[in-house]
């Protein structure tokens, strides 16, 4: 089977049109990204990428921060493709003048060519210089009416792969007495539920034991709470996915992480696994096994 040809993505466009957002989105998709690369170094960069097994997807950002070199960008792209048989894609990010003016006013920054301090003059001069590059671009995205989330979604749609779009959930039980997990996105306190700790026959065991699990899950208070909690999660999770989140960590806590949190986490993992990939872990369980 022939080795898959590496591709080079060249990102350019108007200052303020979303290149910073694009960098973060591409990195999240597994791209090796170099920002502010002078066009004359494109050939050297590609040689490095092409000869390395560490990088399968690479992107460079070139804009007018390197104005003295930018005029050579189109020629450098053509030279690179002719001499090294590179399959490159040029992405041009654009936005209307009025939107760019508004964005610069919000950030209190100036475009790179606003030498006199006049925003519009700098934007229009930049647009004129970039026109040749825009004409040879493979993909042009106008970000004028796009939110950050919408721009990320467009980039994932065009440059992502199936693996990029995966979403998974980790359900974790823990004990508050040992600290809240710092990487949890959602923390649910179930210390208000009936506690098997006070049942002598159940105290030595954990929520992994069927007797403890049945005790916790059969209680009226648990059933009422769990139904509402699951409904809340099923409502919220699509929103997390829409925001581009790849992994959601749900932490369920009771006092020691032995009985109630383990039982709830077990049931939650079963129910969420009907729709999503789910991993489950019990942070404190080793404290109680083998006692």
Curated annotation (Swiss-Prot):
ATP binds at residues 13-20. InterPro entries: P-loop_NTPase (IPR027417), RapZ-like (IPR005337), RapZ-like_N (IPR053930), RapZ_C (IPR053931). Keywords: ATP-binding, GTP-binding, Nucleotide-binding. The keyword ATP-binding applies. GTP binds at residues 63-66. SUPFAM superfamilies: P-loop containing nucleoside triphosphate hydrolases. GO terms for molecular function: ATP binding; GTP binding. Gene3D superfamilies: P-loop containing nucleotide triphosphate hydrolases. The keyword Oxidoreductase does not apply. Pfam families: PapZ_C, RapZ-like_N. Displays ATPase and GTPase activities. Belongs to the RapZ-like family. This is Nucleotide-binding protein LGAS_1315. It comes from Lactobacillus gasseri (strain ATCC 33323 / DSM 20243 / BCRC 14619 / CIP 102991 / JCM 1131 / KCTC 3163 / NCIMB 11718 / NCTC 13722 / AM63).
């Amino acid at each position: 089977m022939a080795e898959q040809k590496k591709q080079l993505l060249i990102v350019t466009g108007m200052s303020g049109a979303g290149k910073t957002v694009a960098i973060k989105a591409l990195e999240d998709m597994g791209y090796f990204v170099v920002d502010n690369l002078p066009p004359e170094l494109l050939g050297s960069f590609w040689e490095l990428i092409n000869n390395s097994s560490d990088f399968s997807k690479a992107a460079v950002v070139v804009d007018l921060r390197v104005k003295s070199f930018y005029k050579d960008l189109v020629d450098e792209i053509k030279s690179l493709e002719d001499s090294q048989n590179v399959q490159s894609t040029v992405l041009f990010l654009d936005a209307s003048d009025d939107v760019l003016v508004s964005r610069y006013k919000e950030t209190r920054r100036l475009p790179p060519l606003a030498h006199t301090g006049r925003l519009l003059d700098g934007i229009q001069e930049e647009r004129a210089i970039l026109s040749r590059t825009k004409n040879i671009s493979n993909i042009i995205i106008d970000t004028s009416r796009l939110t950050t989330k919408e721009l990320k979604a467009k980039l994932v749609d065009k440059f992502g792969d199936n693996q990029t779009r995966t979403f998974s959930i980790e359900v974790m039980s823990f004990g508050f007495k040992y600290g809240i997990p710092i990487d949890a996105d959602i923390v649910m306190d179930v210390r208000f539920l009936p506690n098997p700790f006070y049942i002598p026959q159940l105290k030595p065991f954990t929520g992994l034991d069927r007797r403890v699990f049945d005790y916790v899950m059969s209680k009226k208070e648990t059933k009422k709470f769990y139904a509402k909690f699951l409904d809340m999660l099923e409502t919220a999770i699509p929103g997390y996915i829409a925001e581009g989140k790849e992994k959601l960590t749900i932490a369920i806590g009771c006092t020691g992480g032995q009985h109630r949190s383990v039982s709830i986490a077990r049931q939650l993992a079963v129910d969420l696994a009907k729709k999503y990939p789910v991993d489950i872990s019990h942070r404190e369980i080793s404290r109680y096994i083998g006692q």
